[in-house]
Amino acid sequence: MNIIKKGFLMNEEIREKEVRVIAEDGEQLGVIPTSEALKRAEEKELDLVMIAPTGKPPVCKIMNYGKFIYEQTKKDKEAKKKQKVINVKEIRLSATIEEHDIGIKANNARKFLKAEDKVKVTVRFRGREMEHSNVVGNKILKTFLSKVEDVCVVEKPARLEGKNMTMVLAPRK
């Protein structure tokens, strides 16, 4: 058989003397010698797969290994589809930004939030702009927030970090 290995020992690779065997229909066959378990699997043209090597004795199941791997891969893909990757998009504003430009940036943020992404809004201060950074930064971020507050919640409120004032917005559920 040319099947990709997923970390399971099967058939002749099983080196234990005795194993606990489960039939393909889920019935417990009990603890039997590995050679007998292999014979039973071969009679049914199936594989003996060790599914729990840490058990005493190890647990093996008689099954179609190719079908088993296919089902496992299918389950993994389904689980991966259900996971949602949350991206953090950054929108940068300057301390001297005009009202209209804030509106345009807010529309971009609205698109990101509707796509279930978080938005980090950053106001950058340069040179002398730092003298009034708290007042100016809070005013700009409040204006920005007023334009998008219907589609978001504030995850992290406005905070001064060095030469930047940042705020993180998350989509409304």
Swiss-Prot record:
This is Translation initiation factor IF-3. The lineage of its organism: Bacteria, Bacillati, Bacillota, Clostridia, Eubacteriales. Monomer. The gene is infC. IF-3 binds to the 30S ribosomal subunit and shifts the equilibrium between 70S ribosomes and their 50S and 30S subunits in favor of the free subunits, thus enhancing the availability of 30S subunits on which protein synthesis initiation begins. Coiled coil: none annotated. Pfam families: IF3_C (PF00707), IF3_N (PF05198). GO terms for molecular function: ribosome binding; translation initiation factor activity. NCBIfam families: infC (TIGR00168). Belongs to the IF-3 family. Keywords: Cytoplasm, Initiation factor, Protein biosynthesis. InterPro entries: T_IF-3_C_sf (IPR036788), T_IF-3_N_sf (IPR036787), Translation_initiation_fac3_CS (IPR019813), Translation_initiation_fac_3 (IPR001288), Translation_initiation_fac_3_C (IPR019815), Translation_initiation_fac_3_N (IPR019814).
